[in-house]
Amino acid sequence: MAAKEVKFGREARERLLRGVDILANAVKVTLGPKGRNVVIDKSFGAPRITKDGVSVAKEIELEDKFENMGAQMLREVASKTNDIAGDGTTTATVLGQAIVQEGVKAVAAGMNPMDLKRGIDAAVDEVVANLFKKAKKIQTSAEIAQVGTISANGAAEIGKMIADAMEKVGNEGVITVEEAKTAETELEVVEGMQFDRGYLSPYFVTNAEKMVADLDDPYILIHEKKLSNLQSLLPVLEAVVQSGKPLLIIAEDVEGEALATLVVNKLRGGLKIAAVKAPGFGDRRKAMLEDIAILTSGQVISEDVGIKLENVTLDMLGRAKKVNISKENTTIIDGAGQKAEITARVNQIKAQIEETTSDYDREKLQERLAKLAGGVAVIRVGGATEVEVKEKKDRVDDALNATRAAVEEGIVAGGGTALLRAASALTVKGGNPDQEAGINIVRRALQAPARQIATNAGEEAAIIVGKVLENNADTYGYNTATGEFGDLIALGIVDPVKVVRSALQNAASIASLLITTEAMVAEMPKKDTPMPPMPAGGMGGMGGMDF
């Protein structure tokens, strides 16, 4: 076991604080509409330029083990806030640094760390309750656009695009962000249910120019297993031919004799048909086929439930107004499913999302939910260079997360103003002087985000904060982008409650742990042993050679 180095008391806390300061000072320059950029070196490719706090925090690793512990604990504040709210990482870092700095000073002055922690917790609880009380629910598309614009560092076109996407696919719909191949940023909305499987044979194409197969008012056969035997498929094919409607077959695979017969029938014009593979794999495939069945009012043909293919009748097939199939994707538009059944399925998936602990499973469940509930919107982020695209994509991701958080818990005045007001409204009393000191630590720390936003804009922070506090209106604050004071909610300078609340709660949680730290243990740095010197006379076996 490697030897360990141990630090105690004041020395331990000072080393922690040094690490906290290094990370926070690198992150906090990005805060606000006039925040600066941070350039991150990459071992290959161009350096990355970002104004995203958590991206900066994740890149910082310090040489000194004890300082690094402080930096990593503060990084946890940013990461946790990003996981919960998807934005507010820089605010959380600034709050965390402010609480730790004040707390370490208080402990050095002889105060009881545990009482300080109790005071900090009591103050944070009251501030969070105050934020919920002041929160304003957002209803309109314009308000959603405002939240997106603020989180995208003032880029109005990003805010508007996110508002448009949310309007089209609903709050339950999936909005994904991808890098575009062009310089333009654009929004694409896919209506209905789309899955990433295309036609099994190009002979199914109905529009040779676009290479797509369009089926109007088709029957949909949903089969769990492979289809290779033609005989079992014949009864259902004959029934569909007599109905005069097109047919879409969704199965694990269609091959051999069955596929050849379908293609021949399509080419002869006897049957308008297309076949695609079922989406997903394993249990997820079963669940997605069930989703398609509910959406189209059909049944999954599976021997597990005792239905054989040769016994299938037309009323077991799904229906939709239109199906569009390209080489890569199949889109089912306006399925004939019952609204009550679709709602029940949506609620079932929501319950699974609540229960799952896996991020991957949650993402896949949310995709399924969107396909059933509304649709999918894709924001393709473009730019002149790869570096610009990556930086812009970070901002779009932040803006998207912030708008979702705003819809969930409402909004408060932005620019750090809500926390400033909450500091003034703190009335909770501590049980002793040390707890009172903990409450005062939070009261002072709540000013830090507003001060940092002003500092990054080149303003005198104390003057700006003083002027804001002179006016008692809750929403009165400073618009850093224009340099004017006014009603921030009316000006569209807003923050989601979920973002502000998560930032404060996570900052206080980690800061309390750092303040109550009394000992630190780290591995001693390994001493590199020098290579032994080469023996005299060079390499063996070289004697007697003439040069």
From Swiss-Prot:
<dbReference type="InterPro" id="IPR027410">
    <property type="entry name" value="TCP-1-like_intermed_sf"/>
</dbReference>
<dbReference type="InterPro" id="IPR018370">
    <property type="entry name" value="Chaperonin_Cpn60_CS"/>
</dbReference>
<keyword id="KW-0963">Cytoplasm</keyword>
<feature type="binding site">
    <location>
        <begin position="30"/>
        <end position="33"/>
    </location>
    <ligand>
        <name>ATP</name>
    </ligand>
</feature>
<dbReference type="InterPro" id="IPR027413">
    <property type="entry name" value="GROEL-like_equatorial_sf"/>
</dbReference>
<keyword id="KW-0067">ATP-binding</keyword>
<dbReference type="GO" id="GO:0005737">
    <property type="term" value="C:cytoplasm"/>
</dbReference>
<dbReference type="GO" id="GO:0005524">
    <property type="term" value="F:ATP binding"/>
</dbReference>
<keyword id="KW-0413">Isomerase</keyword>
<comment type="subunit">
    <text>Forms a cylinder of 14 subunits composed of two heptameric rings stacked back-to-back. Interacts with the co-chaperonin GroES.</text>
</comment>
<dbReference type="GO" id="GO:0042026">
    <property type="term" value="P:protein refolding"/>
</dbReference>
<feature type="binding site">
    <location>
        <begin position="87"/>
        <end position="91"/>
    </location>
    <ligand>
        <name>ATP</name>
    </ligand>
</feature>
<dbReference type="InterPro" id="IPR002423">
    <property type="entry name" value="Cpn60/GroEL/TCP-1"/>
</dbReference>
<comment type="function">
    <text>Together with its co-chaperonin GroES, plays an essential role in assisting protein folding. The GroEL-GroES system forms a nano-cage that allows encapsulation of the non-native substrate proteins and provides a physical environment optimized to promote and accelerate protein folding.</text>
</comment>
<dbReference type="GO" id="GO:0140662">
    <property type="term" value="F:ATP-dependent protein folding chaperone"/>
</dbReference>
<protein>
    <recommendedName>
        <fullName>Chaperonin GroEL</fullName>
        <ecNumber>5.6.1.7</ecNumber>
    </recommendedName>
</protein>
<feature type="binding site">
    <location>
        <position position="495"/>
    </location>
    <ligand>
        <name>ATP</name>
    </ligand>
</feature>
<dbReference type="GO" id="GO:0051082">
    <property type="term" value="F:unfolded protein binding"/>
</dbReference>
<feature type="binding site">
    <location>
        <position position="51"/>
    </location>
    <ligand>
        <name>ATP</name>
    </ligand>
</feature>
<dbReference type="GO" id="GO:0016853">
    <property type="term" value="F:isomerase activity"/>
</dbReference>
<dbReference type="InterPro" id="IPR001844">
    <property type="entry name" value="Cpn60/GroEL"/>
</dbReference>
<keyword id="KW-0143">Chaperone</keyword>
<dbReference type="InterPro" id="IPR027409">
    <property type="entry name" value="GroEL-like_apical_dom_sf"/>
</dbReference>
<feature type="binding site">
    <location>
        <position position="415"/>
    </location>
    <ligand>
        <name>ATP</name>
    </ligand>
</feature>
<keyword id="KW-0547">Nucleotide-binding</keyword>
<comment type="similarity">
    <text>Belongs to the chaperonin (HSP60) family.</text>
</comment>
<dbReference type="Pfam" id="PF00118">
    <property type="entry name" value="Cpn60_TCP1"/>
</dbReference>
